[in-house]
Amino acid sequence: MLKIIIPTIMLMPLTWLSKKNMIWINTTTYSLLISLISLSLLNQPSNNSLNFSLMFFSDPLSAPLLVLTTWLLPLMLMASQHHLSKEPLIRKKLYITMLTMLQTFLIMTFTATELISFYILFEATLVPTLIIITRWGNQTERLNAGLYFLFYTLMGSLPLLVALISIQNLTGSLNFLLIQYWNQALPDSWSNIFLWLACMMAFMVKMPVYGLHLWLPKAHVEAPIAGSMVLAAILLKLGGYGMLRITTMLNPQTSFMAYPFLMLSLWGMIMTSSICLRQTDLKSLIAYSSVSHMALVIVAVLIQTPWSYMGATALMIAHGLTSSMLFCLANSNYERTHSRTMILARGLQTLLPLMAAWWLLASLTNLALPPSINLIGELFVVMSSFSWSNITIILMGANITITALYSLYMLITTQRGKYTHHINSIKPSFTRENALMALHMTPLLLLSLNPKIILGFTY
């Protein structure tokens, strides 16, 4: 495991020691190399997990998320180059250091064996994200957004610490790999119901479940491009990962405590999808679509069948790549028109035809068109929810329809129509941006050839 963590940490001195014209080249190439090394973790010969040490382990659930984390760092660096070009050198270096620090924490979170260390690292990811949002965001509302982000996440996850200490008293250990052999079910009592709520709340806020999702659109809209990418692609997946890990420990509470949250998520995914139809702000639309996709993941995790677990894992990976790509596209529009409003960026297809092709591909993967892995994830979730209760087919069908509607609405508003006068002289798309989109799109299409590596531990 250290062969990934230590090179990532060493990216920080590399950043500070690089010459002025070599910062971006060095960091991007080395982080790409790290992500290629991490691919070896996807090959899991044993049927349980790879234990590297007492601290770190990797199993078919954490390996894809870890590879996604390492894959996104070079992409974030590529996306950030333009809007940091006017910053002084020291701030560029600080920015890259923050991203690298965040990546280190995330890798360690996804591979931690022990619940308290998982909790500490889970909270540590908050600090670099907060600094990135509040320091490099575009508008002054970024401070407000940072405040929302901090308080929602902290208030949600404080009860988790108390719950973990009580689990420690109950079982004598907080090791993921040992607790799964703990055979005494939790008795039905009020204290255990509160224990379940405390454990779940932290991850529900992080996901976010509908009703606790208000920090997400704010944080997404105000964050700079790398902040949006890492927030949508990985920080939301921390919630799903934690839920997948901890629901199996808390049975039989989960089976009856899950009902209100299942209802809330099924309702919330329709609501947030409908909100998307009326958005004018491009980044806000993508943020709300993230909420509706994550609601599907919550439903899948709480149903607790092997099929739904497979769907949840596949959907998390697919959504990570898709939403990150959409944020990159929104950012390339923003850098040219200096506005996030969709109506002011209309008719770009005539001016940037290649970007229009990427927009089309990204919108189609967002609405889960075959052969993308989004379809695989959504099919598993829809089928498992249908076998859990037949009525959900109405809600699921409505959600899929509305998702298709707002994805196409986003595509048509930004690409078609007569272009406005203030974008007569815009720069053509750079090779950097096209490479960035290709690096997002290729995994989405290639994974559909061999989806078993992202189907999690129940495959």
UniProtKB/Swiss-Prot annotation:
Location in the cell: Mitochondrion inner membrane
Q: Which Pfam families match?
A: Oxidored_q5_N (PF01059), Proton_antipo_M (PF00361)
Q: InterPro entries from the xrefs?
A: NADH4_N, NADH_Q_OxRdtase_chainM/4, NADH_UbQ_OxRdtase, ND/Mrp_TM
Top EC class of this enzyme: translocase
GO MF annotation list? NADH dehydrogenase (ubiquinone) activity; ubiquinone binding
Keywords, ordered alphabetically: Electron transport, Membrane, Mitochondrion, Mitochondrion inner membrane, NAD, Respiratory chain, Translocase, Transmembrane, Transmembrane helix, Transport, Ubiquinone
Provide the transmembrane region boundaries.
Answer: 22-42, 60-80, 95-112, 113-133, 147-167, 193-213, 224-244, 256-276, 284-303, 308-330, 351-371, 391-411
Q: Which GO terms describe its biological process?
A: aerobic respiration; electron transport coupled proton transport; mitochondrial electron transport, NADH to ubiquinone; mitochondrial respiratory chain complex I assembly
Q: What is its main location?
A: mitochondrion
Q: Name one GO cellular component term.
A: mitochondrial inner membrane
Documented EC number(s): 7.1.1.2
The protein's annotated catalytic reaction(s) are: a ubiquinone + NADH + 5 H(+)(in) = a ubiquinol + NAD(+) + 4 H(+)(out)
Q: What does this protein do?
A: Core subunit of the mitochondrial membrane respiratory chain NADH dehydrogenase (Complex I) which catalyzes electron transfer from NADH through the respiratory chain, using ubiquinone as an electron acceptor. Essential for the catalytic activity and assembly of complex I.
Q: How does it assemble?
A: Core subunit of respiratory chain NADH dehydrogenase (Complex I) which is composed of 45 different subunits.
| Family membership | Belongs to the complex I subunit 4 family.
Q: What is this protein called?
A: NADH-ubiquinone oxidoreductase chain 4
Its source organism is Equus caballus
